[in-house]
Regions:
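Structural/interface elements that position substrates and couple domains in central-metabolism enzymes
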Residues: 1-227
Length: 227
């Protein structure tokens, strides 16, 4: 039985690291088909989710009350999952340079709780090269595991438009990628199970990262023209 089949059968779990306006809708979408561990460092936010309150207002209280996501602020629960999705923020420093502290912190937490054979997929908006040159080395160092041997990686940029109740995560085409061709196909297969709008498998992680940068740039240019 493949890992994909094990995820669908409930034998293996998926984790979502970062339950904000990006992570929460993804967690809820996957929880309809796969057992999901939803992790966030903010214990107060976790308690709100457990009580049926959606502080992000992205999916609504009714959906939160019904979802089967296993909400937790305990990082050791990540050991239960084999497929991890990182959806933490990527803010900007005062000098307008990217602040990679959140993604590096998430990488460190995953490294401390990574089991052999796991796949780590980043969704956070980053410039080309961050996944493989910044995040993966942290996971590798902390876990003591070898990249593309003991664990694998992918990148699938978040494309959610916050507050848009019509174009939800399932209805926005997803770009996917993997650290090897085989892992890329697997990551694409996992996302295809919930993204009804379809997916596009990029040839490499860096290409997927660049696609997000280009999309954001195009959006800024279009807004500038309208203004």
């Amino acid at each position: 039985m493949s890992l994909y089949e094990k995820l669908l059968s409930g034998e293996e779990k998926l984790s979502l690291v970062g339950l904000g306006y990006v992570g929460m809708p993804i967690a809820v979408a996957f929880a309809r088909k796969i057992q999901v561990v939803g992790f966030d460092l903010n214990a107060k936010k976790i308690e709100l989710y457990k009580s049926g309150v959606d502080p992000t207002n992205e999916v609504g209280n009714d959906v939160i009350k019904e979802t089967k996501v296993d909400f937790t602020a305990d990082p050791s629960k990540l050991k239960e999952a084999k497929f991890h999705i990182v959806a933490v923020p990527t803010p900007v420093n005062p000098d307008h340079t990217p602040d990679l502290t959140p993604v590096e912190g998430a990488s460190r937490i995953l490294g401390q709780n990574l089991t052999k054979g796991s796949i780590v997929v980043f969704e956070s908006t980053v410039y080309p090269g961050v996944t493989e040159d910044e995040c993966i080395p942290v996971v590798e160092k902390v876990s003591g595991k070898k990249f593309n041997k003991d664990f694998f990686a992918g990148y699938s940029p978040e494309r959610i438009n916050p507050g848009d109740k019509q174009h939800t995560v399932e209805h926005i085409k997803k770009v996917t990628s993997g650290s090897t061709p085989e892992i890329g196909k697997f990551v694409n297969e996992v996302y295809s199970s919930v993204i009804t709008a379809g997916t596009h498998l990029a040839p490499t992680i860096k290409v997927a990262e660049a696609a997000k940068v280009i999309e954001n740039s195009q959006r800024d240019i279009n807004i500038a023209f309208v203004n």
